[in-house]
Amino acid sequence: MDKFRVQGPTKLQGEVTISGAKNAALPILFAALLAEEPVEIQNVPKLKDVDTSMKLLSQLGAKVERNGSVHIDARDVNVFCAPYELVKTMRASIWALGPLVARFGQGQVSLPGGCSIGARPVDLHISGLEQLGATIKLEEGYVKASVEGRLKGAHIVMDKVSVGATVTIMCAATLAEGTTIIENAAREPEIVDTANFLVTLGAKISGQGTDRITIEGVERLGGGVYRVLPDRIETGTFLVAAAISRGKIICRNAQPDTLDAVLAKLRDAGADIETGDDWISLDMHGKRPKAVNVRTAPHPAFPTDMQAQFTLLNLVAEGTGFITETVFENRFMHVPELSRMGAHAEIESNTVICHGVEKLSGAQVMATDLRASASLVLAGCIAEGTTIVDRIYHIDRGYERIEDKLRALGANIERVKGE
């Protein structure tokens, strides 16, 4: 397994170009299964999960090519089962189910894998599809969905806000007969992006970005060209990198209006922030950040995917900060690893109390999930001495060339090939 070796401390400064959003690219790739004409998807990040999704679409019979953009032609899809071999590494594969059953009347997906953070059950996906008229069976580790004729529009009230299930229901409803209303829908920018992609193909969707999405079913979806929105979590991660190293950064190809909650907390921490249409700049003027209190919740509140990075910020900030995680359980696995580097923190149920220290020291640490591992790499950039971050395959699932981008900002980081 590959590792990162990071020498610190360094001040991170310069410019970084933000990649397309993984959390929009994945649902959009699977939504392309609904199209009866070729689609071109631009600004798709080069990531492990994206490669796995493309491989899965190919196995289903779609023609998939990548030459800058990703081209998908799903006209000849003739396999309706997403096998365990591919699904086990990535829970996003569940998003194949809605498009398959909506367009072909059948689909099966192995129960998914992915990051090990808390219970992320597929029951909300299943109940949504059942309400649209699909018959669902769980057999031999597979979710099997089928319908006679077309799915039927329905008024669906989500038990809890779920990005994944909102995507599944919205995609399936585009080809259903009649109108579907999703109440308590997720409002994330990536949901809006997926909806806008479907509209480009001819879907009739309104209300995306609010908690009530309306989909009027159409008979077929055509082709089109679509550009994936910038990755707000990657943007936030690099902004935190500059903040904790007392540096200065400009993020290009960013979308500031998707990051309001994060930018507000960075300003509270003492950062000087400016924004334009597609850029964000942050300048700490050489100052140490101030501790902030953060509570994660569904969008537009503070994103859970930025929690680990802000935990790190608080651990090297002036003062004491409280971080409360309300979205996923079991999401403080980075805290004991950061403690090995000299951080002072206590975990009390779903809150971590961070007591800022002047400096961290390099250590050997282990990545546990995608965002936690990014925070360990950033910790290595500002710690004194050498930090080895193990199991970095987690990072490769969600960050495109993170070491190259950090190096361009002045980090001393190298990838060490594993046995």
Swiss-Prot record:
Its main location: cytoplasm. The modification 2-(S-cysteinyl)pyruvic acid O-phosphothioketal is found at residue 115. CDD domains: UdpNAET. It catalyses: phosphoenolpyruvate + UDP-N-acetyl-alpha-D-glucosamine = UDP-N-acetyl-3-O-(1-carboxyvinyl)-alpha-D-glucosamine + phosphate. UDP-N-acetyl-alpha-D-glucosamine binds at residues 91, 120-124, 160-163, 305, 327. One of its GO terms (molecular function) is UDP-N-acetylglucosamine 1-carboxyvinyltransferase activity. GO terms for cellular component: cytoplasm. Keywords: Cell cycle, Cell division, Cell shape, Cell wall biogenesis/degradation, Cytoplasm, Peptidoglycan synthesis, Pyruvate, Transferase. Its EC number is 2.5.1.7. It comes from the Bacteria. Pathway: Cell wall biogenesis; peptidoglycan biosynthesis. It holds the Pfam family EPSP_synthase. Phosphoenolpyruvate binds at residues 22-23. The active site is at residue 115. GO terms for biological process: cell division; cell wall organization; peptidoglycan biosynthetic process; regulation of cell shape; UDP-N-acetylgalactosamine biosynthetic process. InterPro entries: Enolpyruvate_Tfrase_dom, Enolpyruvate_Tfrase_sf, MurA_subfamily, RNA3'P_cycl/enolpyr_Trfase_a/b, UDP_GlcNAc_COvinyl_MurA. Belongs to the EPSP synthase family. MurA subfamily. This is UDP-N-acetylglucosamine 1-carboxyvinyltransferase. The lineage of its organism: Bacteria, Pseudomonadati, Pseudomonadota, Gammaproteobacteria, Enterobacterales.
